[in-house]
A protein has these predicted regions:
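NAD(P)-dependent short-chain dehydrogenase/reductase
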Residues: 124-125, 136, 148-208, 212-223, ...
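Short amphipathic alpha-helical interface segments enriched in basic and hydrophobic/aromatic residues
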Residues: 37, 70-73, 188, 192, ...
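Residues that form or immediately flank small-molecule/cofactor binding pockets and catalytic motifs
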Residues: 52, 132, 171, 204, ...
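C-terminal substrate-binding subdomain of Rossmann-fold SDR/epimerase-dehydratase oxidoreductases
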Residues: 191-301
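Short, electropositive, low-hydrophobicity segments enriched in small/polar residues
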Residues: 11-17, 39, 54, 77, ...
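Short glycine-rich loop/turn motifs that provide flexible caps or phosphate-binding loops at active sites
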Residues: 6-9, 34, 72, 93, ...
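N-terminal Rossmann-like NAD(P)+-binding domain of SDR-like oxidoreductases, especially those catalyzing
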Residues: 1-169, 213
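Short, solvent-exposed loop/helix junctions and linker helices
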Residues: 6, 89-92, 140, 177, ...
Length: 301
């Protein structure tokens, strides 16, 4: 078996590479715009330093590939607002390049990393795949466009596709120093250094956190199960407040950190929760929980 991971030097992509590198031939295509080659240290993979917009490079990477995991993207919401045209070029045109070449080369399936951001700030929870998307940013719009392109290719018989809408993914190799870093790596970094942990607003915002290794397992499941086609939520279906997340991390780190409150951030969604029943009913079962994932992440630092 041969797999191609676009964006495979990134946080989630590198975990897919780690999952497959002993059981499959793994090709990673990444221009290291936000990915890091150190994420692939010790992994038996073929690395191609190139953009998904480079048709020749994508064609070379695609030779003999059975399954494509399309992780490459502009992943920062604020950056997408600052540079919407570049976001569209990378996230939509880049995906189209990969889809076309995957179809031409005879790849069996493409699994696309979509996002819960497509739901927007409509307050109804849990989020179900049948709900009308309401993207609020160029990033979210690009992910919805990507889903539509995947569906179009599948409906026309060019290549099977599955799109997984990631909720709040966390785990090892998530960068706490990024300008757009997620809560878990920031909280862990500060807790391990006994620094204050900042909560925006009252900290009662809730999220559906999902461990990266279950994200990888779900992507692998989607790739190899013929019946898994279309769009699926990927979360645990569990609500966790940002305040309780911080408390759990402080306790795990045996830290003296305390929480401080700042003003709410404009545009922040108050509550986000997946309905994962569609994916679960297809046969996927998580192997981790928020608690076990946090513990393993902490131990990796």
């Amino acid at each position: 078996m041969k797999v191609l991971i676009t964006g495979g030097a990134g946080f989630i992509g590198s975990h897919i590479a780690e999952y497959y590198h002993t059981s499959a031939n793994v090709v990673v295509l990444d221009n290291l715009r936000t990915g890091c080659s150190n994420n692939l240290t010790g992994l038996n993979v073929e690395f191609i330093n190139a953009s998904i917009l480079d048709r020749d490079a994508v064609s070379a990477a695609m030779r003999g590939v059975d399954y494509v995991f399309h992780m490459a993207a502009m992943v920062s919401v604020p950056e997408s607002v600052e540079q919407p045209d570049l976001c569209h070029e990378i996230n939509v045109e880049g995906l189209n390049t990969v889809l076309n070449i995957a179809a031409e080369s005879g790849a069996k399936k493409l699994c696309f990393a979509s996002s819960a951001a497509v739901y927007g700030d409509e307050p109804t929870i849990p989020k179900r795949e049948s709900m009308k998307p309401q993207p609020m940013t160029p990033y979210a719009t690009s992910k919805l466009d990507g889903e539509n392109h995947c569906e179009e290719f599948a409906n026309n018989g060019h290549i099977d596709t599955a799109c997984l809408r990631f909720f709040n993914v966390f785990g090892p190799r998530q960068n706490p120093n990024s300008a757009y870093a997620a809560a878990v790596p920031i909280f862990m970094h500060r807790a391990m250094n006994s620094q204050p942990i900042t909560l925006h607003g009252d900290g009662e915002q809730t999220r559906d956190f999902v461990y990266v290794k279950d994200v990888v397992r779900a992507m692998a499941f989607a790739a190899t199960q013929n019946k898994v086609q279309g769009v699926y939520n990927l979360g645990y279906g569990k609500r966790t407040s940002i305040k309780s997340l911080a408390q759990s991390i402080i306790q795990l780190a045996d830290s003296t950190s305390h929480m401080v409150h700042e003003d709410e951030r404009v545009g922040d969604i108050k509550h986000s929760l997946a309905s994962p029943e569609k994916l679960f009913s297809a046969g996927f079962t998580p192997a981790f929980t928020l608690e076990s994932g946090l513990k393993e992440t902490m131990e990796s630092l």
